[in-house]
Regions:
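Short coil turns that delineate tetratricopeptide repeat
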Residues: 164-165, 199, 237
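Catalytic-site signature of metal-activated, phosphate-bearing donor transferases
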Residues: 41-47, 58, 64-189
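Short aromatic/hydrophobic "clamp" motif used to bind/position activated sugar donors
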Residues: 55
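A conserved acidic beta->alpha catalytic loop
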Residues: 1, 13-22, 35, 59-62
């Protein structure tokens, strides 16, 4: 889906055991990067190979739909070098018809000469700076169905075992990993620790209230689960997902009476 949109393609292989490397070599230079449990290190290595004015990053399971491909080509033609970062929609949730139900903006196009650096061993990101522009060419995440991996959780646990401290973003995603693996009591502790951090992003804190509520519900602490949801009201205007979760708890409790 990305053939022809870029002036060069830099592919970094972190140790695939299928035919990824052979297939990728047909489209651009493939650099090997020994896996070291650090996604930022791999991305920073890949970014160091880029030689064009702007660097666009995509994961192996990201695609451009035909309409978004045309939007990206039009955006590319418009770039005059004044933008340092171009934020583009990232579609990650879909309904049964394949229509996007959730998206966020990601730092998708970055000026190469600005030497942006990825941060975070897992769920890595680049902190946007400089002249930031928004576009409408969406990237679609098409993750193949598979069992939920414990890779990310192990990376976090290895970091903690080494005595490293997680920043706010890392603490948030660590709590989510614990929740996904049904380690509910630990998830409660991790979500509470994140919510106590002053520098956590508001959106992450709202989602943490949802995650905390889910963990408490699984532990049978339904009243605490409700209070966890209402804590998000002090952060921002009540979100629909939070209100629906609170209503679901109340409805279930009323039916049980």
């Amino acid at each position: 889906s990305v053939r022809g949109i870029a002036d060069e393609i830099c592919i970094t292989d972190t140790g695939s055991t299928d035919k990824t490397r052979e297939i990728a070599q047909k489209y651009g230079t493939v650099q090997a990067f020994p896996w070291c449990d650090d996604f930022s290190a791999a991305r920073n290595f890949s970014f160091a190979q880029a030689r064009m004015d702007y660097t666009l990053w995509l994961d192996a399971d990201d695609v451009l739909l035909p309409s978004d491909r045309q939007k990206l080509l039009a955006l590319k033609a418009e770039l005059d070098g004044t933008a340092d970062v171009v934020m583009l929609p990232y579609h990650t949730g879909f309904d049964e018809q394949g229509r996007p139900t959730f998206f966020c903006y990601r730092e998708r196009l970055l000026k190469t000469s600005a030497h942006f650096r990825w941060q975070g061993a897992v769920h890595e990101c680049i902190v946007p700076r400089g002249n930031i522009r928004y576009g409408d060419a969406a990237v679609t995440h098409r993750k193949p169905p598979c069992a939920y991996s414990d890779r990310n959780l192990k990376i976090y646990e290895n970091l903690l075992a080494k005595g490293e401290k997680l920043d706010a973003r890392g603490s948030y995603y660590y709590a989510r990993e614990l929740l996904a693996h049904k380690r509910y009591a630990q998830a409660v502790e991790a979500f509470e620790a994140f919510l106590a951090m002053p520098d956590g992003w508001t959106e992450n804190k709202i989602d943490a209230c949802l995650g905390l509520s889910q963990a408490l519900t699984a532990l049978g602490e339904r009243e605490q689960a409700k209070r966890a949801l209402t804590r998000s009201f002090a952060l921002e205007v009540p979100r629909s997902a939070v209100c629906c979760a609170l209503a679901a708890l109340e409805y279930a409790d009323n039916r049980a009476r």
